[in-house]
Amino acid sequence: NKILVGSDDYDTWLRIAQITDQFLYVNKKLSYVLFHDARTSNNKDMSIPQRLVVRDFMHLFDKQQKLNLEIKLRYISGNYNYLNNNSEKAKKDFMFVIRNGVIRLKLRSLLMIILIILKNIKLT
């Protein structure tokens, strides 16, 4: 599914988890990720495919897990919108995170809103 590009591995792990919970934690680096300008997540709002991936599993989430997921997706969306100069949408997403997220994400979101304000002041 082309829509899920960038989130397809997440989809695979969720489907495996429906079959078994026999996962082991390996405290060792097994691979590396190369960050470059042409990677999919730079050019795409990754909250969209991630939202699509989890929709089939939402019935398994409790209220707090659903809220935590929404916070994560809004933070991802906010960053994408900031980078693509959609300031109003980014501010809306970051405000949701500030109202509902954990302190680390609240602070990051506040910083992003400050950057948006400073960027808008600089443009005027």
Which residues fall in each region the model found?
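A ubiquitous short alpha-helical element
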Residues: 38, 60-64, 79
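Membrane-interface aromatic/basic loop that binds lipid-linked glycans or pyrophosphate carriers
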Residues: 78-124
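Secondary-structure boundary motif
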Residues: 18, 59-63, 99, 103
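Conserved nucleotide-sugar donor-binding catalytic segment
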Residues: 1-47
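N-terminal alpha-helical segment
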Residues: 71-74, 90
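C-terminal, non-catalytic tails of nucleotide-sugar-dependent glycosyltransferases
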Residues: 22-23, 47-72, 123-124
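Inter-repeat boundary and helix-capping residues of tandem alpha-helical solenoids
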Residues: 6, 67-68, 103
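Alpha-helical elements of Rossmann-like donor-binding domains used by nucleotide-donor carbohydrate transfer enzymes
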Residues: 11-15, 49-53, 76-77, 92, ...
